[in-house]
Swiss-Prot record:
Membrane topology: Peripheral membrane protein
NCBIfam families the UniProt entry points to: 3a0107s01c2
Organism of provenance: Bdellovibrio bacteriovorus (strain ATCC 15356 / DSM 50701 / NCIMB 9529 / HD100)
Protein name, entry field: Phosphate import ATP-binding protein PstB
Pfam families tied to this protein: ABC_tran
Role, per record: Part of the ABC transporter complex PstSACB involved in phosphate import. Responsible for energy coupling to the transport system.
Record-level GO BP terms: phosphate ion transmembrane transport
Gene3D superfamilies: P-loop containing nucleotide triphosphate hydrolases
Xref: PANTHER family: ABC TRANSPORTER I FAMILY MEMBER 17
């Protein structure tokens, strides 16, 4: 099966002031595939994920070197002439803890569209329904769209956050430990959802759960101390890693 690039990290160095966090990362992200970033706490995986949609720009001492190219036009989204807000519309993100806005379910999903200046009500309504359908939440909330989002269960709130990210039709969806605050049943729903979403959107996920990475991902990148140690097909990484450090991590010898 042919693999097409959706994004490519090239020689990415990232620092907070004088502290270097990423040491020249080069990594492909393939279209309509799930790429898992794994590694012990502090290895740089969440830092790398947040580079994709310029979240670090919110901090004054953040410094990027290198490129993140978005295909097919190979534009460098780290370029100084690129608007970070536009990047965040094209590359959505869902965080570790569900963070619905203190608004209605409808307004949460419509938020990105209204920020973008979309005014056509019928289009917004269509996108809200479509995104909630994609997030497997529509049937549970269709009769209470104008109820508060904070009244939803934790698992429903996380699916709402996924719907909110999907509403602007991002090219890539970033998931930062999306199930770590959820119960096992909600976790299973999110994992099943990831498998469905990959048909429509490219996904990169940070997870501390090696079992989850093996279950949901097509490719896995193992990071350690700011370096990318090994990248490959997930079945190869988890059954026949090439680097001893990868094997030590996935067999529980450290981390």
């Amino acid at each position: 099966m042919q693999l097409n690039l959706r994004a490519e990290v090239k020689n990415l160095v990232f620092s907070y002031g004088d502290k270097k966090v990423l040491n020249g990362i080069t990594l492909p992200i393939y279209e309509n595939r799930v790429t898992a970033l794994i590694g012990p706490s502090g290895c740089g995986k969440t830092t790398l994920l947040r580079c994709f949609n310029r979240m670090h720009d919110l901090y004054a001492n953040a410094q990027y070197q290198g490129e993140i190219l978005l295909y097919p036009n190979q534009s460098n989204i780290l370029g100084k002439d690129i608007d970070p807000m536009e990047v965040r519309m094209r590359i959505g993100m869902v965080f570790q803890k569900p963070n619905p806005f203190p608004k209605s379910i409808y307004d949460n999903v419509a938020y990105g569209l209204t920020v973008r200046g979309v005014k056509k009500k019928s289009f917004i309504e269509e996108q809200v329904e479509k995104s909630l359908q994609q997030a497997s939440l529509w049937n549970e909330v269709k009769d209470r769209l104008h109820s508060s989002a904070t009244a939803l269960s934790g698992g429903q709130q996380q699916r709402l956050c996924i719907a909110r990210a999907l509403a602007t039709e991002p090219e890539i969806l970033l998931l930062d430990e999306p199930t770590s605050a959820l119960d096992p049943i909600s976790t299973r729903h999110i994992e099943e959802l990831i498998q469905e979403l990959r048909k429509d959107v490219t996904i990169a996920i940070v997870t501390h759960s090696l079992h989850q990475a093996a279950r949901v991902s097509d490719f896995t990148a193992f990071m350690y101390l700011g370096d990318l140690i090994e990248f490959g097909a997930s079945d190869q990484i988890f059954t026949n890693p090439k680097d001893q450090r990868t094997e030590n991590y996935i067999t529980g010898r450290f981390g």
